[in-house]
Amino acid sequence: MQRYPLAVEQAFPPEPVFLLTAAMQDVVREGTGQALKSYLPPEITVAGKTGTTDEQRDAWFAGFSGDRLAVVWVGYDDNRAARLSGSAAALPIWGDLMAALTPEPLALARPERIEMVSIDPQSGLRGGSSCPGARELPFMQGSAPSDRAPCSGPMDAAVDAVNQAVGETTKRAKTFLERLFGR
């Protein structure tokens, strides 16, 4: 590959790529891919997705780190059911492979138009420190739920207002500095 020059061209806007990658990191952190914790050290962050086709004919895991990408498929080439799931069959193979390759951690820079919003997992509405289990999740600016979860209190709304004001001030300062010094 090193003999053939690669021309890297961005094909998609950074915001949807960030959102999809964040969701795939959650699969590994707390979903069907969480068994990877036993293969990789905690500082190696990865993103991935398990898969199992109808009637368990195929099992797969596709994932990537900061510098590696691999897809593992487990199944029969005559279309017989393997009777295995992606997390049980393909994920361990992927985990062994990545552990042997010692990948770089996946580190994503959050695009400017992505905001982190506290969400109550029970209702899917805006949460806050008053909501047990509330998580910061990424959203395109302006697309986060505006309704508040029943568990969120008046202090959570005040914190949101302060964070929004600080964000607007930071944007204005950045715009001013860009005009002053150029990009």
Which functions belong to the PLM regions below?
Residues 1-138:
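A penicillin-recognizing enzyme superfamily signal
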Residues 117-182:
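Low-complexity, Gly/Ser/Thr/Pro-rich intrinsically disordered linker/tail segments
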